[in-house]
């Protein structure tokens, strides 16, 4: 029976109950909501590949810091589930679907935590969490090592310049090898990384850790590993500890000039010097400290919390920029003031929207100033005013009211009409905005319809809510086939939303077969000179545009660009937006397969206008005509999404697995083997990956598993393109276009 359960059932006296809860570290919400100086604030995320133990680690952190009074498991037998997995679907499936925020305290430092999903289909949750965090804990499985989503998270951290600690988890699992994981971090992720802890035994012999910084052994004893005992390093580990400590010193010396002087001049240095070098290099992203443990067995969590405080930055050590728009000039960069004194105007960034019990909940990070209940703020994008009626801080699905928030705090507001990535400020006149959030393009589409026509209202409400909350979930109606389609990052992504429609809105839906989001692009430049002229009595329509459409480089083949290169007044500037609008409208549907255009630059170079008959509408229609001209005269090809696939299975099935990947047009990029298992890495077209899960199970006797994530768009094979074009033409009731219109 847990301590808190005994308290609730009255098995302890009031005095003993207080002592018991205090020993647990359990504290009231007020303790965590106290205002603290900026040096005592940490904003961290916990990110990793799926099933690496992120949520279990967060549960232990909350317990050891006194935020919760008892621990629950991700797949707990008590039907409670982990604190941060508040959605029923998360608890059923044992996976994290939405990022969840909480805040706690460790050694007088306020730690704001965002636990993120590990599945590639929910990668936007990681993206927007990392955008507003100052540091992160990258969790790696001691068995699985660096996996596909680990690489994705690593790229996201690099994009937002987020310093991180690495925590090699699951030391207790059969086959765990933290030394192999460190080697993968260096080779696959290009991290300058070294252990600052070593395991005392692995698998069933996992007893504790060796701290290489303080040169002591750490053991976790008592109920739930709450008693941390320091001791001498075991005799049989002293040689290895010295070697690994020397390796740590060498890696730090290469990354930090100040510490390098100690090493080169062979000067003695203190533990404080070593810690200072670790902090400097970690914040500068030139070194990654590697810690070890097993969250499930309650080992290594408290030293990880110490490392978060010691080595990850506070909000004042991270430079955050705002941009002030100047008409006709490049935006002016402004460094935001992170001081928690409220002297500067409030600046905050909305990074997540969620429909709560009391209306829309908007998650924000405060970057400058202070925000109090009753204040007015403005959305920098829409210039709409919002009055703050209620301020809350989040503990998973629980909301805790606060009166004010300061720079560095993560909080939420109710009833704010905005989008992810919007900037809010108290001064609407300075046109200040922060850099928004990168949103990947959806790669899979499915037809969707409610099972019962009476549920259409609820279906519409669900779609409206989910598309607003999740920028990677798209909805549209295809007029050609008269189908409603949803697009997302993968089959699981769309299946989860279908299940949520039934659970949360009482609207069961049927999903069709998945469809790949192909794209169409130009093979080479194609010039155009189009005149749109219409006269039917009264004022007519007149617009002429001259220019060229050309392909963008392969690394930009998901973008569409419009460039106004006109000189003089042949195309008046007030009509140029009409040309761009017409271009982007026509880019929604290509000629070969009906898919969107991408990887194209539209260069408007010249044209002509009529003083009476020209208008923005006329130039928009001229753009329509010009693109139809390019459809006919240009050489086109179809692009398809390529996935990075990682398959792990017993060695005896390696030939079968690689054979199946080759049949699916996969290109093998690497293989690894260890202790009877192998891992193969391949790039495979998404169109060829449907049904692979069943094939892998049958060919490996159910022992194989795979993950995949989006890599890039690449031209289709000629026979694949012919098949796609033929299928599209059949649905249009037309014959296949002239072969000259497309190039493979």
Swiss-Prot record:
Additional detail: This protein may be expected to contain an N-terminal transit peptide but none has been predicted.
An annotated Gene Ontology molecular function: GTPase activity
Region feature Disordered, mapped onto this chain: 725-744
Function: Mitochondrial GTPase that catalyzes the GTP-dependent ribosomal translocation step during translation elongation. During this step, the ribosome changes from the pre-translocational (PRE) to the post-translocational (POST) state as the newly formed A-site-bound peptidyl-tRNA and P-site-bound deacylated tRNA move to the P and E sites, respectively. Catalyzes the coordinated movement of the two tRNA molecules, the mRNA and conformational changes in the ribosome.
Metal-binding keyword on record: no
Subcellular location: Mitochondrion
Organism: Drosophila pseudoobscura pseudoobscura (Fruit fly)
Matching SUPFAM superfamilies: EF-G C-terminal domain-like, P-loop containing nucleoside triphosphate hydrolases, Ribosomal protein S5 domain 2-like, Translation proteins
Protein name: Elongation factor G, mitochondrial
Originating gene: mEFG1
Binding residues for GTP: 48-55, 115-119, 169-172
Main subcellular localisation: mitochondrion
């Amino acid at each position: 029976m847990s301590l808190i359960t005994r308290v609730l059932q009255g098995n302890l006296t009031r005095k003993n109950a207080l002592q018991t809860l205090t020993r647990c570290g359990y504290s009231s919400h007020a303790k965590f909501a106290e205002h603290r100086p900026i040096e005592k604030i940490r904003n961290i995320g916990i990110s990793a590949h799926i099933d690496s133990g992120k949520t279990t680690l967060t549960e232990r952190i909350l317990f050891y810091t006194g935020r919760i009074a008892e621990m629950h498991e991700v797949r707990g037998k008590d039907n409670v589930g982990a604190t941060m997995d508040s959605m029923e679907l998360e608890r059923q499936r044992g996976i994290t679907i939405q990022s969840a925020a909480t805040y706690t305290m460790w050694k007088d430092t306020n730690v704001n935590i965002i636990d993120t999903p590990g599945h590639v289909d929910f990668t936007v949750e990681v993206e927007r969490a990392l955008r507003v965090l100052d540091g992160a804990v990258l969790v790696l499985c001691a068995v699985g090592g660096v996996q596909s989503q680990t690489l994705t998270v690593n790229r996201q951290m690099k994009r937002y310049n987020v310093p991180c600690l690495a925590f090699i988890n699951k030391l207790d699992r059969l086959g765990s090898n933290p030394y192999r994981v460190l080697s993968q971090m260096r080779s696959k992720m290009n991290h300058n990384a070294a252990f600052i802890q070593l395991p005392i035994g692995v698998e069933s012999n996992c007893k504790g850790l060796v701290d290489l910084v303080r040169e002591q052994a750490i053991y976790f004893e008592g109920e739930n590993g709450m008693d941390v005992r320091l001791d001498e390093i075991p005799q049989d580990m002293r040689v290895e500890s010295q070697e690994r400590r020397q390796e740590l010193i060498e890696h730090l010396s290469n990354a930090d000039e100040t510490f390098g002087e100690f090493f080169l001049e062979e000067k003695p240095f203190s533990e404080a010097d070593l810690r200072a070098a670790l902090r400097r290099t970690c914040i500068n992203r030139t070194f990654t400290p590697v810690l070890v443990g097993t969250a499930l067995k309650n080992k290594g969590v408290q030293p990880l919390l110490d490392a978060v405080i010691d080595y990850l930055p506070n909000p004042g050590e991270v430079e955050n920029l705002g941009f002030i728009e100047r008409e006709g000039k490049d935006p002016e960069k402004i460094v935001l003031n992170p001081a928690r004194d409220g002297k500067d105007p409030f600046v905050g960034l909305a990074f997540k929207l969620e429909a709560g019990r009391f209306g829309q909940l908007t998650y924000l990070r405060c970057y400058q100033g202070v925000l109090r209940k009753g204040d007015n703020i403005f959305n920098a994008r829409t210039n709409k005013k919002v009055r703050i009626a209620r301020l809350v801080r989040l503990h998973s699905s629980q909301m805790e009211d606060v009166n004010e928030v300061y720079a560095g705090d993560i909080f939420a507001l109710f009833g704010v009409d905005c989008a992810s990535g919007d900037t809010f400020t108290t001064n609407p006149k300075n046109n200040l905005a922060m850099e928004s959030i990168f949103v990947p393009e959806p790669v899979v589409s499915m037809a969707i319809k409610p099972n019962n026509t009476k549920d259409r209202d609820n279906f519409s409400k669900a779609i409206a809510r989910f598309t607003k909350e999740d920028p990677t979930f798209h909805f549209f109606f295809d007029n050609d086939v008269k189908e409603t389609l949803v697009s997302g990052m993968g089959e699981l992504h769309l299946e989860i939303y279908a299940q949520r429609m039934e659970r949360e809105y009482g609207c069961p839906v049927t999903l069709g077969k998945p469809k790949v989001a192909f794209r169409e692009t130009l093979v080479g430049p194609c010039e155009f000179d189009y005149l749109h002229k219409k006269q039917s009595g009264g004022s007519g329509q007149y617009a002429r545009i001259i220019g060229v459409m050309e392909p963008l480089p392969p690394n930009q083949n998901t973008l569409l660009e419009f460039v106004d290169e006109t000189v003089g007044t042949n195309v008046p500037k007030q009509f140029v937006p009409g040309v761009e609008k017409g271009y982007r409208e026509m880019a929604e549907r290509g000629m070969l397969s009906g898919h969107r255009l991408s990887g194209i630059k539209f260069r408007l170079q010249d044209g002509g206008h009529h003083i009476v008959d020209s208008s923005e509408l006329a130039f928009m229609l001229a753009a329509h005509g010009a693109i139809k001209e390019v459809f006919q005269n240009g050489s086109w090809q179809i692009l398809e999404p390529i996935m990075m696939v990682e398959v792990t299975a017993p060695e005896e099935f390696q030939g079968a697995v690689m054979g199946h990947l080759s049949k699916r047009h996969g290109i093998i990029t690497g293989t690894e083997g260890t202790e009877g298992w192998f891992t193969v890495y391949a790039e495979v077209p998404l169109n060829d990956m449907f049904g692979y899960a069943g094939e892998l199970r049958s060919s490996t006797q159910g022992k194989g598993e795979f993950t995949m994530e989006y890599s890039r768009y690449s031209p289709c094979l000629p026979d694949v393109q012919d098949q796609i074009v033929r299928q599209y033409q059949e649905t249009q009731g037309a014959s296949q276009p002239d072969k000259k219109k497309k190039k493979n």
